[in-house]
Curated annotation (Swiss-Prot):
Residues the record lists as binding substrate: 206, 221-222, 250, 435-439, 615-619
Stated name of the protein: Ribonucleoside-diphosphate reductase subunit alpha
Keyword match Disulfide bond: yes
Gene Ontology CC annotations of this record: ribonucleoside-diphosphate reductase complex
Gene Ontology BP terms: deoxyribonucleotide biosynthetic process
Marked site (Allosteric effector binding) residue numbers: 229, 259
Disordered: annotated span: 621-641
Xref: InterPro entries: ATP-cone_dom, NrdE_NrdA_C, RNR_lg_C, RNR_lsu_N, RNR_R1-su_N, Rrm1
PROSITE patterns referenced in this protein's UniProt entry, alphabetically: ATP_CONE, RIBORED_LARGE
Top-level taxon: Viruses
Organism expressing this protein natively: Enterobacteria phage T4 (Bacteriophage T4)
C-alpha cells in the first residue's frame, strides 16, 4: 500500500499509520469471532490520500456493517463498537465522556435538557449517580441498536444533526427526569430504573426515549379521542388531534357517532352531508403537523359495522374510486359485537342505521350494555319510522374481509370482548374505541360533552429472554421499576388540552412484552405447543404488575377513578377473563392470587390498567429483540437508515437459528397457533393486543386465500376473546418476504409502538 496522509479532526495532516486502525479494530473485535486483520484487508482498498479520520471511521463502520450475516453475526457487535467509538469522539471530542454534571450543564445551557435536572438534583447527588453509570455498556449494543439510538433516540439538533449525548447518559437522565419528585429513596429508584434500561431488561417507547429529559413534556404513547355528532365536537376533536400530532403522538379517533348522509338536522330544514366530509377534515388534521419534526401524523378511525354508510366507508382506503369518495391516509377500525357475529353465524341479515337514531341510545348501548343494545336494535329493525337498510351478514363480512386483505389496514375490534374482559366496569366506563395500533382499550368521552375525556396511555415492555422468567422476585422488581416510572410520568408531563388531564385520574399504563419469539426458541417451544408456557409467563408478568401497583397505591393512594374498575370490587384477571380460554390452557396458577386479592381489598390499586401488547418495531432494535410477540420473517432482517441498509440477525442466532418459528413457515400451518398464544396472553392483559394475521397465497389453490379461511380466523379470534385484529399480512412471493425489510411506512407512527 502506497504512503498516504490523513487529516485529523484538528486539521493537521499526518502520515497514515496502519497500526492505529488495527489497534482500534482489535479492540472492537475483542471477545468476538471476527478477525481484525481480515477486516482491515477489506478496508484497505477504500483508503485514499487526504482522507479525514472521520472518513476512515465511516469506512470502518460500513465495512463491518456490510459483513453482518447468518454466518458472521459477530460483525454486528464490531460495527456497533466502531460506531460508538466514533460517536464518543463527535460528542465529547475524545473517547472518554466528560463528567456527568458538566454534561448536564452543557446540555441545559444548549437548551437540549430540562433545567430541572439541575434544580431538582444537587451536585452531590449527580456525582453519586455518575458513580453508578457503566459506560462500557455502550459497547454491548448490536449495530442495529446503536444506529437506532444514534438516528432516533439520542438528543440532537435536528437542523445541524449535532448529537449531544451517549446512551448511558441518556438512560440515567431519563431516570432522573421520571423520578425527580419522588419524596423517598429517590436515588435508589433512579438507579434501579437505569439498571433495568441499560441492561435491556425493559424497553421504552419512542416519546420517552427521545423526549424525556428534554424541555418537551408530552410522552403518552397513545392518544384516543372521541368525536360526537355536533360541529362543535367535530372541530374540538380536530383541534385536539392537531395538538397531539405536533407532540409526536399516534391517534385513535372514534368517529362512529357522526350521523349518516341524508339524516335530518334540527327540525329537518337541512339534510346531513354524511361522514365522509368530516372524516376528510380529520385526515387533514392528522397530516397537518409532522411528528416532532419526523413526518406527518397517523390515525385510525373507529366506527360500528351497522353504520348506515358502512358500504361506502369500508372502501375508503382502497385504490379504486376518486379522491372525493376516498380517504386513504387514515386507517380504519370496524367494530363488531356478539350480535353481529351471531347474525353472520345464522346467515341472517344485519340492519344498518344512522348512529344518531333513538337519540343516540342505540349507539351508546352498543358499548355499554350488550343486552340493552340487542333490545334497542331489534326494536329499531321493526320501527317503520326509522331509516334503515338490510344487508346479508355474510355479504357485509365478505366486503370487510375483501377490503382488509386488499389494503392490509382495515382493522377489526370486537366490542363485547373489549368491554367484557377488562378491568373497567362496563356500565360505568365503557370502551368505545382503540388506538392507532389496536392495543389500547380505555374509556373516552365526547370531547365536547360535560364529561369530556381524551384517553391517554403510557407504554413500556419486558424484554423477554433477558431475565429469568421463572424468578418471580426478579419479575416483581422489573414490574415495580416500570409501574413507578410510568406512573410518575403522568404527573411529570404536560397536557396540551384539558380533556386529557383525566389521564391523571385513571392512571392507565400499558406494559407489554418484546422478544417473545426468541424466548420461545430459548425454551425449545413453538407457537404450536407453548400454551401452558405462555399461560405461566403472562400470569407471572401480570401478577408482578398488579403487585407493584398495589404497593404504589399503599404509598401514594389508589387512582381517583378507582371505583370505575373491577379492582374496586376485589376482582382480578382470574375472575373476568373469557372462560373459553380454559379449553386451550388449563387454569393452573403458580402465583398466590388469594394473598394478592387481600392486599387489593386493603390498599386498592394505583393504576386502572397495567398491561397492553403493542408492536415493538423500533425499540426491539435497541434491545436486540424480536418484535413484540410476533414471529420474525427470517433469521436476517434488513434495516434501512440514513446511511444505507444493513442486516440484523435474530437474537442468539448461533445457537437458536433452527429453533425459531419464522413467519411464513408458521403461516403454512395457518394463523391459529399464533392467535392461540395471543388469546392466552389476553387472559391476563388489561387492555388489548395488536394481533396480526399472515397469509401465503402460494399454499392455496389458484394462489388465492379463500374467504372462508380469513373469516374462520376472525371467528376463532373472537371466540377465544381476542379484542382487535391489526395488520393483514400477505406474502407477495417476491423472495424478499423471508427477510424483514424495514423502511418507514407512510401513515405510520412510532409513538404508540415501542
Amino acid at each position: 500500500m502506497q504512503l498516504i496522509n490523513v487529516i485529523k479532526s484538528s486539521g493537521v495532516s499526518q502520515s497514515f499509520d496502519p497500526q492505529k486502525i488495527i489497534k482500534v479494530l482489535s479492540w472492537a473485535a475483542e471477545g468476538t469471532s471476527v478477525d481484525p486483520y481480515e477486516l482491515y484487508e477489506n478496508i484497505k482498498s477504500y483508503l485514499r490520500d487526504g482522507m479525514t479520520t472521520d472518513d476512515i471511521q465511516t469506512i470502518v463502520i460500513k465495512a463491518a456493517a456490510n459483513s453482518i450475516s447468518v454466518e458472521e453475526p459477530d460483525y454486528q457487535y464490531v460495527a456497533a463498537r466502531c460506531l460508538m467509538f466514533a460517536l464518543r469522539k463527535h460528542v465529547y471530542g475524545q473517547y472518554e465522556p466528560r463528567s456527568f454534571i458538566d454534561h448536564i450543564s452543557y446540555c441545559v445551557n444548549a437548551g437540549k435538557y430540562d433545567p430541572e435536572l439541575l434544580s431538582k438534583y444537587s451536585a452531590e447527588e449527580i456525582t453519586f449517580l455518575e458513580s453508578k453509570i457503566k459506560h462500557e455498556r455502550d459497547m454491548e449494543f448490536t449495530y442495529s441498536g446503536a444506529m437506532q439510538l444514534k438516528e432516533k433516540y439520542l438528543v440532537k439538533d435536528k437542523t445541524t444533526g449535532q448529537i449531544y449525548e451517549t446512551p448511558q447518559f441518556a438512560f440515567m437522565t431519563i431516570g432522573m427526569a421520571l423520578h425527580q419528585d419522588e419524596p423517598v429513596d429517590r436515588l435508589k429508584h433512579v438507579i434501579r430504573f437505569y439498571e433495568a434500561v441499560s441492561t435491556r431488561q425493559i424497553s421504552l417507547p419512542t416519546p420517552i426515549m427521545a423526549g424525556c429529559r428534554t424541555p418537551t413534556r408530552q410522552f403518552s404513547s397513545c392518544v384516543v379521542i372521541e368525536a360526537g355528532d355536533s360541529l362543535k365536537s367535530i372541530n374540538k376533536a380536530s383541534a385536539s388531534i392537531v395538538e397531539y400530532i405536533s407532540k409526536r403522538a399516534g391517534i385513535g379517533i372514534n368517529v362512529g357517532m357522526i350521523r349518516a348522509e341524508g339524516s335530518k338536522i334540527g327540525m329537518g330544514e337541512v339534510r346531513h352531508t354524511g361522514v365522509i366530509p368530516f372524516w376528510k377534515h380529520f385526515q387533514t388534521a392528522v397530516k397537518s403537523c409532522s411528528q416532532g419534526g419526523i413526518r406527518g401524523g397517523a390515525a385510525t378511525a373507529y366506527y360500528p359495522i351497522w353504520h348506515l354508510e358502512v358500504e361506502n366507508l369500508l372502501v375508503l382506503k382502497n385504490n379504486k374510486g376518486v379522491e372525493e369518495n376516498r380517504i386513504r391516509h387514515m386507517d380504519y377500525g370496524v367494530q363488531l359485537n356478539d350480535l353481529m357475529m351471531e347474525r353472520f353465524g345464522k346467515n341472517d341479515y344485519i340492519t344498518l342505521f344512522s348512529p344518531h337514531e333513538m337519540g343516540g341510545e342505540l349507539y351508546y348501548s352498543y358499548f355499554k350494555d350488550q343486552d340493552r343494545f340487542r333490545e334497542l336494535y331489534e326494536a329499531a329493525e321493526k320501527d317503520p319510522n326509522i331509516r334503515k337498510k338490510r344487508i346479508k351478514a355474510r355479504e357485509l363480512f365478505e366486503l370487510l374481509m375483501t377490503e382488509r386483505s386488499g389494503t392490509a389496514r382495515i382493522y377489526v375490534q370486537f366490542i363485547d370482548n373489549t368491554n367484557n374482559y377488562t378491568p373497567f366496569i362496563r356500565e360505568k366506563a365503557p370502551i368505545r374505541q382503540s388506538n392507532l395500533c389496536c392495543e389500547i382499550a380505555i374509556p373516552t368521552n365526547d370531547v365536547n360533552s360535560p364529561d369530556a375525556e381524551i384517553g391517554l396511555c403510557t407504554l413500556s415492555a419486558f424484554v423477554l429472554d433477558n431475565f429469568d422468567w421463572q424468578d418471580q422476585d426478579k419479575i416483581n422488581e422489573l414490574a415495580e421499576v416500570q409501574v413507578r416510572a410510568l406512573d410518575n410520568l403522568l404527573d411529570y408531563q404536560g397536557y396540551p388540552v384539558p380533556e386529557a388531564e383525566k389521564a391523571k385520574k385513571r392512571r392507565n399504563l400499558g406494559v407489554g412484552v418484546t422478544n417473545y419469539a426468541a424466548w420461545l426458541a430459548s425454551n425449545f417451544a413453538s407457537y404450536e405447543d407453548a400454551n401452558d408456557l405462555t399461560h405461566e409467563l403472562f400470569e407471572r408478568l401480570q401478577y408482578g404488575l398488579i403487585k407493584a401497583s398495589i404497593k404504589l397505591a399503599k404509598e401514594k393512594g389508589p387512582s381517583e377513578y378507582y371505583s370505575d374498575t373491577r379492582w374496586s370490587r376485589g376482582e382480578l384477571p382470574i375472575d373476568w377473563y373469557n372462560k373459553k380460554i380454559d379449553q386451550i390452557a388449563a387454569p393452573k396458577y403458580v402465583c398466590d392470587w388469594s394473598a394478592l386479592r387481600e392486599d387489593l381489598k386493603l390498599f386498592g390499586i394505583r393504576n386502572s390498567t397495567l398491561s397492553a401488547l403493542m408492536p415493538c418495531e423500533s425499540s426491539s432494535q435497541v434491545s436486540n429483540s424480536t418484535n413484540g410477540y410476533e414471529p420474525p420473517r427470517g433469521p436476517v432482517s434488513v434495516k434501512e437508515s440514513k446511511e444505507g441498509s444493513f442486516n440484523q440477525v435474530v437474537p442468539n442466532i448461533e445457537h437458536n437459528i433452527d429453533l425459531y418459528d419464522y413467519t411464513w413457515k408458521l403461516a403454512k400451518k395457518g394463523n391459529k397457533p399464533y392467535l392461540t398464544q395471543v388469546a392466552i396472553m389476553l387472559k391476563w392483559v388489561c387492555q388489548s393486543a395488536s394481533a396480526n394475521t399472515y397469509y401465503d397465497p402460494q399454499i392455496f389453490p389458484k394462489g388465492k386465500v379463500p374467504m372462508s379461511i380469513m373469516i374462520d380466523d376472525m371467528l376463532y379470534g373472537w371466540y377465544y376473546g381476542i379484542k382487535n385484529f391489526y395488520y393483514h399480512n400477505t406474502r407477495d412471493g417476491s423472495g424478499t418476504d423471508d427477510y424483514e425489510i424495514e423502511t418507514p411506512k407512510a401513515d405510520d407512527c412510532a409513538a404508540c409502538k415501542l
